[in-house]
Amino acid sequence: MKQSHFFAHLSRLKLINRWPLMRNVRTENVSEHSLQVAMVAHALAAIKNRKFGGNVNAERIALLAMYHDASEVLTGDLPTPVKYFNAQIAQEYKAIEKIAQQKLVDMVPEELRDIFAPLIDEHAYSDEEKSLVKQADALCAYLKCLEELAAGNNEFLLAKTRLEATLEARRSQEMDYFMEVFVPSFHLSLDEISQDSPL
């Protein structure tokens, strides 16, 4: 049986730090970011279904979100100001991401490839799926800004402002619900979020 390096590569996502050009009170790696995006994307899908008449597969959304940055294990996490410096760079980076996604898919044993390819190749996402994952991705970046600012790190002030504009552009009913119900707690201390539910 032929060996596959697929999961050995994915395990290295934890070695790639996000926000590499900014001082961080606490560094965040791509692996933990992907887990948070998966949880938030699942929540957005569940909220959409339960509250706003949606009909999306929340579990699939969580899986797509879990793999949404998988190609960064081959490309690294390019800082946003570089990635979107101009339209040409953004377009070229998209092409590089596509190649990296295909390279990852090709690592999967052929008999399993049809399972993993639609998770890694974002071109297999429906528009609705892509929208939910992008909303969750932006929300998690925004939450990171809130955490850094709460720790006194003003380095994230402009990033927060930029992400507020991104969230506004991707705004949805499910995002509004999430922002109203879950986000305010990110401004609180551990004692404040624990006082209602002591162990």
UniProtKB/Swiss-Prot annotation:
GO MF term list: 5'-deoxynucleotidase activity; metal ion binding; nucleotide binding
Stored InterPro entries: HD/PDEase_dom, HD_domain, YfbR, YfbR/HDDC2
Catalytic activity: a 2'-deoxyribonucleoside 5'-phosphate + H2O = a 2'-deoxyribonucleoside + phosphate
Chain ranges of the HD domain: 30-142
EC number: 3.1.3.89
Cofactor(s) the record lists: a divalent metal cation
List of residues binding a divalent metal cation: 33, 68-69, 137
Keyword Protein biosynthesis annotated: no
Name this polypeptide is given: 5'-deoxynucleotidase YfbR
Lineage, uppermost ranks: Bacteria, Pseudomonadati, Pseudomonadota, Gammaproteobacteria, Enterobacterales
GO cellular component terms, semicolon-separated: cytoplasm
Keyword Hydrolase applies: yes
Top enzyme category: hydrolase
Sites annotated Appears to be important in orienting the phosphate for catalysis: 18
HAMAP family recorded: 5DNU
Any Pfam family the entry gives: YfbR-like
Annotated source species: Shigella flexneri
Keywords annotated in UniProt: Cytoplasm, Hydrolase, Metal-binding, Nucleotide-binding
Subcellular location(s) per record: Cytoplasm
Ligand binding (substrate): 18-19, 33, 69, 77-80, 137
Similarity-based family: Belongs to the 5DNU family.
Self-association and partners: Homodimer.
